[in-house]
Amino acid sequence: MKGVSTQRGLAGLVSAVLLLGASSGCGYGLVGRGGGFDPSIKRIGVPLFRDGTGKVNLDMKITQKVIEELLKRGKVDVVQSIEGVDAIVEGEILTFQETPVGFSGGSTGSTTASRYAITLTVRVRYYKPGEVQPMWQNDAFSYRDEYDLGSDANSFFDRADQGVDRLALAFARSLVAAMLEAF
C-alpha cells in the first residue's frame, strides 16, 4: 500500500504545482500580442515621410499605407498633421533598391532580367511630442519583396508599380507590428 500512497502524494504535488503555475501568471506570453497603443494616445500624427531616394510618389505611398495600417490596429485617430496629436510617427526613406534576381534567356540568345527584388530602408521614430525618449525607434527598418517582370517587356512599368504598391503595404504592416510589439 505504500506505493499507492506515494503515487497519490506525487499526483497531489504535481497538481499543486500546475495549479500554482496557472494561477500565478507564469510570465509567458504570445509573441506579437503586445498591448497595442498606449491608452493615453488618442490621436497620432503621421506627416509625409521624407524621401531621400528620388523615387516618384514613394513617400506618399509609404505614408498612406502606414496611416491605413495604424487605423486598422486600434481605436485612434490618425492624421497627416503633427498639430494637436498625442504621438507622432516620423519617417525618412533612406534607400530604395531594385535588383534583378532572376533571369531568362531570350530567343536571340540574350539574357534578360525576369524577376526583381525591391529593398526599402527607412528611419522611423514613434514619440510623444515634448518627450526626449521615443516610445520606439529604428534607424534602419528594412523590408524586401520580389516581383516577376513577366515575358512582356511592355508591362515592365506596370509590374514595377504593382511591386512597389505591394511592398508599401507589406512594409507598413511590418512596421506597425514592430512599433506596437514594444507595448
Where are these regions (language model features)?
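Bacterial N-terminal signal peptides
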Residues: 12-23
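Bacterial N-terminal signal peptides that target proteins for export
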Residues: 2-13
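Surface-exposed short loop/turn segments
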Residues: 73-77, 83-136, 144-157, 162
